[in-house]
Amino acid sequence: VDAFPFVDNPVLYHAVSNAVTKNGKLIYLTATSTEELDKKVKKQEIKRVSLPRRFHGNPLVVPKKVWLKDLRKKIEKKQVPTKLLKLIKEQRKTSFPLILFVSEIELGDKILSLLRRDFKNEIIELVTSKTDNRLELVEKFRNQEITILVSTTILERGVTFPKVDVFVIEANHRLFTKSALVQIAGRVGRSMERPTGKLLYLAEGSSKEMTQAIKEIKEMNREAGF
């Protein structure tokens, strides 16, 4: 079973447990384990099998923390912070697709408007849970018909975009949990054509979740022999 929907949901654990036959096997598949599953491993109630290396044989891309000050204040003044503007300009010289992850739809709307103003040569769209044509936009981004995609955590997992770079805006926001940050990081370096990429956690300061996410990614690389 896919372990992701099980987070903090004892009802699902109970339902699946009841569904397994007497001699049946129950296998949870996940890129980011839950506290409940980790506890079961420590108690030796279940066994953990890890596949830390990607199919192309390269290490996971490790996020880099970047200080980004006064984002909200600048946005309210209808300005993109100078550092963020510079980072995006540098990234666009590569022509690789770029995803900007944001915590909230409202913030995403504002950033979308400002980026369209400042990057008139780019095709920029926003994807959220309320986007009716989300699948269409995702496919266009995959086909490079869209060059910059602003997204909430709706695209943190379950999608693959070749050669993509990722910036997480306000990575220290409470909605960016360790699990979410690890999953978002996993969008980078997924293709054989480009098993690397630029992966930035931008925030005014840091958070426990940011530090834990980076630690977990480094541990997976060590486990894979890097």
Q: Language-model segments: which ranges?
A:
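Post-DEXD/H (motif II) to motif III coupling segment of the RecA-like Helicase ATP-binding lobe
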Residues: 1-70, 77-86
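Loop/turn-to-beta-strand initiation segments
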Residues: 21-29, 96-97, 145-148
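Conserved segment of the helicase C-terminal RecA-like domain
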Residues: 21-36, 178-181, 185-218
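A short beta-strand element within the Helicase C-terminal
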Residues: 159-172, 182, 198-201
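Conserved helicase motor
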Residues: 103-106, 124-136, 150-157
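Short glycine-/polar-rich loops that comprise or flank the Walker A/P-loop
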Residues: 21-25, 44-47, 120-122, 162-165, ...
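A short beta-strand-to-loop transition that corresponds to the Sensor-1 phosphate-sensing loop
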Residues: 29-33, 52-54, 102-105, 151-154, ...
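Conserved strand-helix element at the start of the C-terminal RecA-like helicase core
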Residues: 26, 81, 87-115
